[in-house]
Amino acid sequence: MTVLVVDTSAVVALLKSEPGWETLATRLHAASSRVLSVANWVELSLVAAGRHGDEATLEFLDRFLQTAAIEFNSVDEPQARIAREAFLRFGKGRHPAGLNFGDCFSYALARTLDAPLLFVGNDFIQTDVRVAMEVREQARS
């Protein structure tokens, strides 16, 4: 069973059809199980509501996640501790990776499940998390 942890950045890129979205979609589809931290679901909701500000946008987001078979994973105390440690090691203002709050929860979920992380950008490659796509694959798309 191939579990894939999905970061907020990957969902945003898919929803906005950003460059490389096709490769992200292929990776997402290839996984037998896709998971998103509930902390990242809230982050996605805040981003969507901040840009569009209506309930229909949030309903669209939830339908997309359901259609993509992305399951929510609750944050427990051990995972929260890993997220806190991720900030101390890789957080904004502390490390070139510059992980933000949501990034720390994606990192923690990937580490907890020992699963690759699907994301967009150069932040997570500067950490010790397993990555689902190399940056050059993102750039080629």
Which residues are covered by each model-predicted region?
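Short, well-structured N-terminal submotif of metal-dependent ribonuclease cores
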Residues: 1-36, 49-63
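Acidic, PIN/NYN-like endoribonuclease modules and their adjacent C-terminal/linker elements
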Residues: 3, 107-141
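A generic structural signal for short hydrophobic patches within well-formed alpha-helices
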Residues: 11-12, 41, 124-125
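General small-molecule cofactor/ligand-binding pocket signal
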Residues: 35, 71-73, 132
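Short, hinge-like loop/turn segments at secondary-structure boundaries
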Residues: 51-55, 90-92, 134-138
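Active-site neighborhoods of divalent-metal-dependent phosphate/nucleic-acid chemistry enzymes
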Residues: 71-116
